[in-house]
Amino acid sequence: MSDLQESLEKLSINEKAPQAPADDATPSNTTTLEKESSESAAAAAGEGAGEEGEEASASLYVGELNPSVNEALLFEIFSPIGQVSSIRVCRDAVTKKSLGYAYVNFHKHADGSRAIEELNYSLVDGRPCRIMWSQRDPSLRRNGDGNIFIKNLHPAIDNKALHDTFSAFGRILSCKVATDELGQSKCFGFVHYETAEAAEAAIENVNGMLLNDREVFVGKHVSKRDRESKFEEMKANFTNVYVKNLAPEVDNAKFEEIFKPFGPVTSVHLETDQEGKSRGFGFVNFENHESALNAVKEMNDKEIDGQKLYVGRAQKKRERLDELKRLYESTRLEKLSKYQGVNLFVKNLDDSIDSEKLEEEFKPFGTITSARVMVDDAGKSKGFGFVCFSSPEEATKAITEMNQRMIQGKPLYVALAQRKDVRRSQLEQQIQARNQMRMQNAAAAAGMPGQFMSPMFYGQQPGFFPPNGRGGAQGPFPPNPQMMMPRGGQMPPPQGQWPRAGPNGQPVPVYGMPPVYGGEFNGPNGQRQQRGAYPPNRNQKGGRPQRDLAAIISTVPVDQQKRILGEELYPKIVATGKAQEPEAAGKITGMMLDLENEEILALLEDDELFENHFEDALTAFEEYKKGEQAE
């Protein structure tokens, strides 16, 4: 017992204090941590299964990790302990971001034990990690016999301090202090022991003692289901009453006198400020439920000292917040249903248009219940507003007549008003659809089945084979002749029937195929030459100007327009130097060809616009390659 006393004194447990009330053993705000605690317990402490179970498992759960921690960093930390068989950082299935915990598997159980002893609560990328035995048996994880709850902890007490305090009573499977979004302690936590006896010893010795000058309460952990069932029972048999709108001159003595006629009062509490003045509300706790119920019935809305009192069942803070949220949500839905189909959103308003002018413009279409132009803090118009009609028919008529109408030299945009969350959801769906289309294009360019991809080949020109400097053929067929077929279905000439070279080393198109030019060819002196997508004008050295490209596109069949645009895009993509992989340029070209022809023409003329679309396509290609490598 001397060892136990010494251990407790190290953590400032100074003296025994009065026992905390049993009915307040577990607060309602432990729900968040309970989920975390169950996750910890889910990963925790296989060592509780006995020596035989321990020898069969050498898997550790490592929690509280920084999102930047990866498998390589964990291997550097754990490999000096012993031979590591595998490491897995758990990630979100969609975003692939770390969930903040990982599993480390050793070949030997002894190495796992040593890792817990030496590395538990050590800093990993600036955060103290929690290491426990992984327990994959759900029946053992959910066993709460050895689980205790501690509240009123000092904010300075972290996971390690809590572990050091309670490890004196037995073997700990998991230990955690609840924290908020900023990592600050919520002043309560959980300790899960291997045995129920160790938990009982901790409750007996630490409950009601001072830890860092704070009296702590330690009790058995009660599951959420049990708490809720108990809470419903407490609500039906409440004894604690909340009173507000009290006059400033009401003190504790007068407060008690007001409620004594309804039954025996066990305690009263009047809330005061720092100066000791009443804050106008307090609590009265009766000995039995009947007295509390009578007080609520008789005193609610009764006037005392010129103030109409509110008297009702005392609620926990969380319960009250939930009730307010439900009330707010019902009010919001009622308001939305009331204005569904009658409230219009109007934008592109001139700065001179105010709410009165807006109402005048829309008044001919029906009865307006409200019209408002939104303004900033300085009172200047934001360029948009809302008009609410009395019926959906009037609103529909206003949309038909006023949308795109010129007002003060600006065309109005008029549509049904949407909630912010609906607009955000629609935008997210559009972005998701666009990203999905890009990924489909990348997959199609990679030749995955089930995806349609226009047959094109970017490396040699479809429709002919490049002649050498002497006018003969050079090199074998391309690796995939089908990729060279035009959509019209013409086949390249059989092997051995090579087209001869034309004047100036220009290739002669294969019979029946459109004369599409471009790609790299051998010139008269055997040099590589880059040509445009169209035959160059004899009177000029370069290819056609981009401004003529749209006119030329309009003269060719629809099924060949993408091919021609692709021959323009491909050399431009290659020229960026960013498509490093052999097949990258061709696949990115295929992705960018998914745009409308007008957009592609704009890309070819605007380098900045081209760069933006190229970067998006390159990113999609790189993500696809990473996913392919992972598979």
Curated annotation (Swiss-Prot):
Any one Gene Ontology cellular component term annotated for this protein: ribosome
GO molecular function: molecular condensate scaffold activity; poly(A) binding; promoter-specific chromatin binding; ribonuclease inhibitor activity
Cell compartment(s), UniProt: Cytoplasm; Nucleus
Residues annotated as transmembrane: none
Gene3D superfamilies: 3.30.70.330, c-terminal domain of poly(a) binding protein (1.10.1900.10)
Keywords for this protein: Cytoplasm, mRNA processing, mRNA transport, Nucleus, Repeat, RNA-binding, Translation regulation, Transport
GO biological process, one term: regulation of translational initiation
InterPro entries on file: Nucleotide-bd_a/b_plait_sf (IPR012677), PABP-dom (IPR036053), PABP_1234 (IPR006515), PABP_HYD_C (IPR002004), PABP_RRM1 (IPR034364), RBD_domain_sf (IPR035979), RRM2_I_PABPs (IPR045305), RRM_dom (IPR000504)
Pfam families recorded: MLLE (PF00658), RRM_1 (PF00076)
Domain RRM: 58-136, 146-223, 239-316, 342-419
PANTHER family: RNA BINDING PROTEIN
Purpose of the protein: Binds the poly(A) tail of mRNA. Appears to be an important mediator of the multiple roles of the poly(A) tail in mRNA biogenesis, stability and translation. In the nucleus, involved in both mRNA cleavage and polyadenylation. Is also required for efficient mRNA export to the cytoplasm. Acts in concert with a poly(A)-specific nuclease (PAN) to affect poly(A) tail shortening, which may occur concomitantly with either nucleocytoplasmic mRNA transport or translational initiation.
Name of the protein in its database record: Polyadenylate-binding protein, cytoplasmic and nuclear
